[in-house]
Amino acid sequence: AYLYFTHAWEKKDKNQDPIFTMENYPKIDGSTATLPLAQAYKSAFTGTDIENVDVTHSKTHNAYVNLINKKSDLILVTYPSEEEQQLAKDAGVELEIVPVVKEAFVFFVNKENSIDNLTLNQIQDIYSGKVTNWKEVGGTDAQILAYQRPQNSGSQSGMLSLVMQGIKMKEPEKETVAQSMVDIVDVVSDYQNKENAIGYSYYYYITTMYSKGKIKLLSVNGIEPTYDNIKTGLYNIQTAYYAVIRKDEPENSNARKLLNAMISTYGQKVAKEAGYVQNY
């Protein structure tokens, strides 16, 4: 399914010669949240109108599997989970992982929830099961329904490494593990007891690909997750979207050429115009 996003890459730079043709463009894959980035890059680097660019992503875990199995040349993803790193090791594949754009990990609640800010410790307590009621963190007397994501999804890997940092997460109830970014947003947004749900995802996805009026992003430790706060590092639950290739790609390979184009000045301009936070 195609996802429509509000920050579209629309204008090709007429002063910029295409680097690739549609025929020799490397086979790319990636996560849901990097699909617009991949489309923007392919449009810019081939000199093709965005509506004529066909890119499909098979989501984070499958993208890693495809790269390891040489079914794709470059993937745009979050950092590999321990399981994905082990898969590569078992296959004798060394991964080259390069940050392309900045990203932040964000938490959201229904707009009717009175809470606007949580500390990182409070979030850890909620997801470890230590805190179970909103009144314990300054909200109303309602049980917290803390949504999780499936293992090996980009969001779950981010939650474990960036937020929990070794603290064991409580076992999720099966109905609270959303199967995709869209699912987790829908459940938090439309849950009947509107004050009691919390979810998490990546900033770009929530603000650009899934702008849904019924949710609000929470400040963490008093800092709002805004574009500027992410770019400056003030909002510090940060990661990146990475371009990953097999390390044995030759210097003159198209995969390596594409990677270098993504982190070039022009590549970063393309990323910014597509709504992502520049890394360089």
Please provide the spans of the model-predicted regions.
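Exported/periplasmic ABC-transporter solute-binding proteins
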Residues: 1-87, 93-103, 108-280
